[in-house]
Amino acid sequence: MTNPVRWLFSTNHKDIGTLYFIFGAIAGVMGTCFSVLIRMELARPGDQILGGNHQLYNVLITAHAFLMIFFMVMPAMIGGSGNWSVPILIGAPDMAFPRLNNISFWLLPPSLLLLLSSALVEVGSGTGWTVYPPLSGITSHSGGAVDSAISSLHLSGVSSILGSINFITTISNMRGLGMTMHRSPLFVWSVLATAFPILLSLPVLAGAITMLLTDRNFNTTFSDPAGGGDPILYQHLFRFFGHPEVYILILPGSGIISHIVSTFSGKPVFGYLGMVYAMISIGVLGFLVWAHHMFTVGLDVDTRAYFTAATMIIAVPTGVKIFSWIATMWGGSIQYKTPMLFAVGSIFLFTVGGLAGIVPANSGLDIALHDTYYAGAHFHYVLSMGAVFALFAGFRYWVGKIFGRTYPETLGQIHFWITFFGVNPTFFPMHFLGLSGMPRPIPDYPESYAGWNALSSFGSYISVVGIRCFFVVVTITSSSGNNKRCAPSPWAVEKNSTTLEWMVQSPPAFHTFGELPATKETKSYVK
């Protein structure tokens, strides 16, 4: 990092991918700090560390959600892993629009600063990540905090849209000779299946929050019934973005897991085409189920019946993916190295979260479970565990390719087990809290919920130790004192891998390929 010009004006996909990883790590640490503050407040009944400032509690909730979704998972998963891997995997010299790639990243730091500054303006933005009116309206949040948070969302949304345009163009037009779409690795497909929902859903969010901005500042009444508006309109627009967003966060992770499971089972992925069409199906179906977040707003009974059925149908392509991963492992010679541990952990935790989600998909049951800790448990199992474990798995899988040095295997496995035994006690008790009726955005609660909350808070402290362990591993791996050079193919996968990143040196040259590779066969698995 000694040459600032190289990093400020870089058009190299590997440099920009590295910047995304660093940014995601910084935002992730901030988001984790906020979550630990939340858990410290909830560790016991009554007012704890926040001294009864319930608005501050909601500001922490809001900042935690935005940081983790828009500034940690999306930049690290799509920006970091996508930028580093996609051009190499398809045999392209770089991304299609290198300078657009640069501005996509550099929109994020000012966006993050806007979000953090919103917490310092008057009483902060305590709206939750949904920013629903009338709570986000000018009467409830009179200062500039919500406006600052909305501006932050606009900037990060532009960044994501530009990035997705870049990925779609790169994958469509810049594949190497012989690299047809049906020969493309599954991670490439997963990024493509993520880029289209980003491109289609984020402009809808932009429209919704722009309406909110004009309601707050220019006296429009899009969300005010007194002027002919309707707050439910905003909910529809936000959720039309919000549900595809969940799949935007998890789909690249499923591509990473497919690579890892194949490599460490010593077998090609079972049902490659089925996996491709499952990812596309998830991307499409994600747009057809948004109102399952809105069963309590007074929807027509037929509408609720449709959204219940459509939500359950999403379980079909998800099941195809999970059974394909299990079939890939079945009968394979499995090596439980750190990436494989995180991949298997991600599959297990994602499955638990998905099964928990089938319950509130029923509109009748959701009346009881809506906005309780059951919903918090469900989406944290899918995201905080499914997506983040996939991120850890992918980082460990490709870290030798990035740094050119191997990571300490024992420490990596310790990181996995500490994190696994941290996140489960954190989020599993939330199912019981939700079933008991504990509502979500509250900093105080009756004594009857104290036991599960204490266990949940204890688990979050263990998770912090796991994150500390992760940074120790990264520091050791990247340090100049680490003399364990990484081979071009550290997992010895030449014979059972068809992906191009193992054919180049570690780390790859500034320009990855001296001459562009030609893909001549679809099956290079040699017995």
From Swiss-Prot:
One of its GO terms (cellular component) is respiratory chain complex IV. It catalyses: 4 Fe(II)-[cytochrome c] + O2 + 8 H(+)(in) = 4 Fe(III)-[cytochrome c] + 2 H2O + 4 H(+)(out). Pathway: Energy metabolism; oxidative phosphorylation. The chain crosses the membrane at residues 18-38, 59-79, 103-123, 149-169, 186-206, 246-266, 269-289, 312-332, 339-359, 375-395, 414-434, 454-474. The keyword rRNA-binding does not apply. One of its GO terms (biological process) is electron transport coupled proton transport. Ca(2+) binds at residues 41, 46, 443. Cu cation binds at residues 243, 292-293. Coiled coil: none annotated. Its EC number is 7.1.1.9. It is a multi-pass membrane protein. SUPFAM superfamilies: Cytochrome c oxidase subunit I-like. There is a cross-link at residues 243-247 (1'-histidyl-3'-tyrosine (His-Tyr)). Pfam families: COX1 (PF00115). CDD domains: Cyt_c_Oxidase_I (cd01663). Fe(II)-heme a binds at residues 64, 380. Its cofactor is heme; Cu cation. Binds 2 heme A groups non-covalently per subunit. Binds a copper B center. Keywords: Calcium, Copper, Electron transport, Heme, Iron, Magnesium, Membrane, Metal-binding, Mitochondrion, Mitochondrion inner membrane, Respiratory chain, Translocase, Transmembrane, Transmembrane helix, Transport. GO terms for molecular function: cytochrome-c oxidase activity; heme binding; metal ion binding. It is found in: Mitochondrion inner membrane. O2 binds at residue 247. Mg(2+) binds at residues 370-371. Component of the cytochrome c oxidase, the last enzyme in the mitochondrial electron transport chain which drives oxidative phosphorylation. The respiratory chain contains 3 multisubunit complexes succinate dehydrogenase (complex II, CII), ubiquinol-cytochrome c oxidoreductase (cytochrome b-c1 complex, complex III, CIII) and cytochrome c oxidase (complex IV, CIV), that cooperate to transfer electrons derived from NADH and succinate to molecular oxygen, creating an electrochemical gradient over the inner membrane that drives transmembrane transport and the ATP synthase. Belongs to the heme-copper respiratory oxidase family. This is Cytochrome c oxidase subunit 1.
